[in-house]
Design a protein with these regions (language model features):
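N-terminal anchoring/stem segment of glycosyltransferases
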Residues: 1-67, 78-84, 251-278
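Short, solvent-exposed loop/turn segments at secondary-structure junctions
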Residues: 11-13, 44-45, 61-62, 95-97, ...
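A structural signal for short, well-ordered beta-strand segments and their strand-loop junctions
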Residues: 38-39, 88-92, 117-118, 159, ...
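Active-site regions of enzymes building and remodeling cell-envelope glycoconjugates
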Residues: 49-62, 74, 114-116, 223-227
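A conserved donor-nucleotide-binding helix/loop in the catalytic core
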Residues: 59-91, 99, 189-198
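Conserved donor-nucleotide/metal-binding helix-loop-beta segment in metal-dependent transferases, i.e.
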Residues: 97-138
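Catalytic core and acceptor-binding pocket of nucleotide-sugar-dependent glycosyltransferases
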Residues: 141-233
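C-terminal catalytic/acceptor-binding lobe
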Residues: 196-278
Length: 278
């Protein structure tokens, strides 16, 4: 029987999602496998902590965006326990497992050279790489030129064999600390780092469709196996991230549309001409 480490961070307001996550993933996710839940939280107690498979780990809440950038370091605090398991998977707090997901459809396939498991980000599943929101800042360790990259993956569900996942965490934690020292914040934080790592290891991961990362209320041609719950129905997301709302002018909207829909063609041609690479 394969052993699965379920890595879950729920600090602050995100603890509201834990009960439904536990209930649906215990019932539907990888039946026949032994699941161990590692819950990193600042809550003094959580639901189901009496279950021997639930391990509550004290974790102070970081301010935004360190709360996402520091994920790899958080996981590594439990390295000795995690390396004893066969597979490790990280899940965003607001996920719920709607359908039964079998090991055959989800786990990496070693016979095909796969050690990691990644999921397509639903906003980009049908777009060309030049339109992906990779980090384009050459000063950032997550930088990807416009002429590079193959897939755009979600930062909120990923994993693999314990050895491969922990090796990835160590490398991405090193890069994150380098960015922090240099005063650089990746565009989408841990997700930008994950996409750079995927671009460097294109044959090393199993890529799942957005069926396994299906935002609540969206309409896509995929089954709804793992649902991403709308956080704004539970708390003020902008307040948690210390974001303020700004009204954009007509000219700003037009410029943003140009940058999103047309500018990538020019930048991709430039990077090809300059023969940029990872």
């Amino acid at each position: 029987m394969a052993t699965i480490g379920m890595l879950y961070i729920c600090t602050g307001k995100y603890t509201v999602f834990w009960p439904e996550f536990y209930e649906t993933f215990s019932r539907n996710f990888l039946p026949g496998c032994k699941k161990e839940y590692f819950i990193f939280t600042d809550a003094p107690s959580i639901a189901y902590e009496d279950d021997p498979a639930v391990h509550r780990i004290d974790q102070p809440a970081y301010d935004w965006p360190l709360s996402t950038m520091k994920r790899f370091a958080i996981f590594l605090t439990q390295e000795k326990a995690l390396e004893q398991l066969d597979y490790l998977f990280f899940f965003n707090a607001n996920l719920t497992c709607r359908e039964v997901i079998t090991p055959e459809e989800f786990l990496p396939r070693p016979q095909q050279g796969e050690q990691l498991l990644l999921v397509q980000q639903p906003g980009f599943w049908n777009k060309k790489p030049m339109f992906y929101s990779y980090d384009r800042n050459p000063r950032c360790t997550a930088y990807i030129p416009y002429n590079c990259g193959r897939d755009y993956v979600s930062g909120g569900l990923n994993g693999g064999t314990s050895a491969a996942f922990l090796a990835m965490c160590k490398e991405l934690d090193r890069r994150t600390e380098q960015d922090i020292r240099n005063g650089v914040v990746p565009l989408w934080h841990d997700e930008s780092q994950l996409n750079r790592y995927a671009a460097e290891h294109p044959g090393n991961y199993r890529l799942l469709t957005p069926a396994y990362w299906y935002p609540e209320g969206w309409q896509m041609p995929f089954e709804q196996k793992i649902i991403v719950r709308n956080k704004s129905r539970y708390f003020d997301v902008a307040a948690v991230k210390h974001h303020s709302q700004h009204t954009r002018s007509w000219l700003q909207c037009k410029w943003e549309a140009f940058c999103e829909n047309y500018l990538p063609y020019l930048l991709c041609a430039r990077d090809k001409l300059l023969q940029k690479h990872l």
